[in-house]
Amino acid sequence: MNDSDQPIVAVIDDDESVRESLRGLLETISLKVALFRSVEAFLGANPPVLPSCIVLDVRLPGASGFELQKQLVAAHVDTPIVFITGHGDIPMSVRAMKAGAIEFLSKPFREQELLDAVRQGIERHRARAGQRRAWAQIHERFAGLTDREKEIMTLLARGRVSKQIAGQLGVSEVTVRVHRSQILQKMGASSLADLVRIADRLKTDDENALDPVAEGPYDGLPRTSRTAKRVTRKQKGRGNLAK
């Protein structure tokens, strides 16, 4: 694994002894660890830290752990979070989990509990990253279609058959079939049903990705997300770990 591929875990806790203890624990499983004493220090890091998982205290000087979680959710940044706290209760735990946290651990907690939660977070991050790469390729393939191919793909996704498409576009059925074959190949679709699934996802990702053909030829491209960049612009125990 290259250094650039190695997961980074951001630990945000205002207690230096806890931060260093967590760094030591996480490094035992060969993880890179970045330490921060506050949310502001994390968001203001230069260069920005883009972690695969965040170990986050609830109570911090300045912005709280919950406030960071809220900001990330609002910016559609889905970095997995493992909350740790010495002052937790059930409502706090429910709040964190409902907002997407991997785990909510009350200090003191067992080392293995934290390691298991961080591993789960990293695996989730990898899975999401893989999905994003796959769909980025789909968007690139769609952008590579001609205007006519985009028109035909839109109509195919709406259940039109070749004869109907030919009549609407004023071309022969043979021409439509040739275009359909080229579209399937370019989009990496194994079948018409697969192409329809891809088209539905494109429309979900961007309402303008498949404009109604009745309003004229499609002339736009799916947008790519820039939320992570927006956030980064604004902006590591052995035994039982207790604050």
Kindly label every feature range from the protein language model.
Residues 57, 85:
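Active-site residues of response regulator receiver
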Residues 35-53:
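Acidic, metal-coordinating helix/loop segments flanking the phosphotransfer/catalytic sites
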Residues 161-194:
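Recognition helix of helix-turn-helix DNA-binding domains
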Residues 37-38, 64-67:
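Acidic catalytic/metal-coordinating carboxylates
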Residues 184-243:
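Basic, Lys/Arg-enriched C-terminal extension of HTH/homeodomain DNA-binding domains
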Residues 89-91, 105, 109-118, 164, ...:
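C-terminal output helix
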Residues 44, 66-77, 95:
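Short amphipathic alpha-helix used as the core "switch/output" element in two-component signaling
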